[in-house]
Amino acid sequence: KGKGFFMPKFYFTSESVTSGHPDKVCDLIADSILDEALRQDPTSHMAVEATIKDDLILVYGEAGTNAVIDYEKIALQVMKEIGYDEEYHVLVKVNKQSSEINGAVAHDEISAGDQGIMFGYADDETEELMPYAIITAHKLAKKLEEVRRQTPFLRPDGKTQVTAEYVDGKLTRVDTIVVSTQHTADVTQEEIRKCIKEQVIDPVIDPSLVDENTKYLINPSGSFVLGGSWGDSDTTGRKIVVD
């Protein structure tokens, strides 16, 4: 009573993923296709998706564009830039956009032919005006990406998660930090945990927000050699909330 809207104490958790997470791989393939379409034809309307499993990449959808796009080349280039050196096969099923749909979205004053419901807010607890947990999870994922590209035993797939503790509506401490990273088979979990704690977590987390009770969970499930599309099947749009 007297505390207003806020619960006396609660925890808020957010996650992020690296570019090598297979969901984000699919997003990046679709984004790169859209970028190429808009580069050639600024009036392009693209509804192209990607799905990946093991060595198969499926690119499919509808395209309303005058651009000439090499879908296979773009998909394979994305995989290479992310850091996956396995051999992939690309199956493309992209048709010309329906004239009925194209006619409904082709007017200059209309920028979209569908609808959605979104919500969001600015939060002054960080410089980015985002809640602490999500912005810190993103920073950890970005740092993990940087360290991975300089560390031979780290591989592209990864996920981060931050749980923040609030008391009377105010951020008080970080309760839990989770970092899961794919790696090669020739490294111990102790080496991985030391690397991630010193090179990823410590440079990102404000030391004033951690204490002796803060939990650091680095590869909590143990070995993470099989990752990317070989460990999961994924598709575009699954990380919209994370984004």
Predicted regions and their residues:
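Short, Lys/Arg-enriched N-terminal segments with co-localized hydrophobic residues
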Residues: 1-6
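Short glycine/threonine-rich loop-to-helix capping motif typified by GTGT followed
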Residues: 62-69, 223-240
